[in-house]
């Protein structure tokens, strides 16, 4: 029972870290990143389709994303979709390829993004703490039902606390790296 609670907690904490990584990848730094366009939807013959399903997305250098549509007829639709996304990007068509230069971030925008990043990090920490609280409540329930002893509960709570500390430090590391990326010019 105790192991199941620990495993469930660890699985949920891992998912929190994965979600944090996903959220952080959506935040634009000054550097080109192909995953930045993952959430752009293109009108593909009347149905909204993710850009990654109608084109090849690569980074040609640290400041440019290169989008190569699989169908020549999609160039205009892809360009329009990138323009209409809230990413503040201005694509330029060069034949059948679309170059998306990354504009440099202003100091004001960097500070704004750092606030967003810190908020996301805090959400991650809160989520991990909530998972710890749930696990501790489950342990207390088991003690009430006399399924485990108080000593077992204390040992399990300490193990869950170590798990919590490990994942919170992981959140802090992700946060520090994203802040460093944002402050690089």
UniProtKB/Swiss-Prot annotation:
User: Where's it mainly located?
Assistant: cytoplasm
Q: Which CDD domains match?
A: RRF
Extract one GO molecular function annotation from the record: ribosomal large subunit binding
Q: Which GO terms describe its biological process?
A: cytoplasmic translational termination
Cellular component aspect of the GO annotation: cytosol
InterPro entries (alphabetical): Ribosome_recyc_fac, Ribosome_recyc_fac_dom, RRF_sf
Task: Enumerate the subcellular locations listed in this protein's record, separating them with semicolons.
Answer: Cytoplasm
Q: Which UniProt keywords apply?
A: Cytoplasm, Protein biosynthesis
Q: A Pfam family for this UniProt protein? A: RRF
Biological function: Responsible for the release of ribosomes from messenger RNA at the termination of protein biosynthesis. May increase the efficiency of translation by recycling ribosomes from one round of translation to another.
* Family of this protein: Belongs to the RRF family.
What is the name attached to this protein's record? Answer: Ribosome-recycling factor
Q: Which organism is it from?
A: Legionella pneumophila subsp. pneumophila (strain Philadelphia 1 / ATCC 33152 / DSM 7513)
Encoding gene, per UniProt annotation: frr
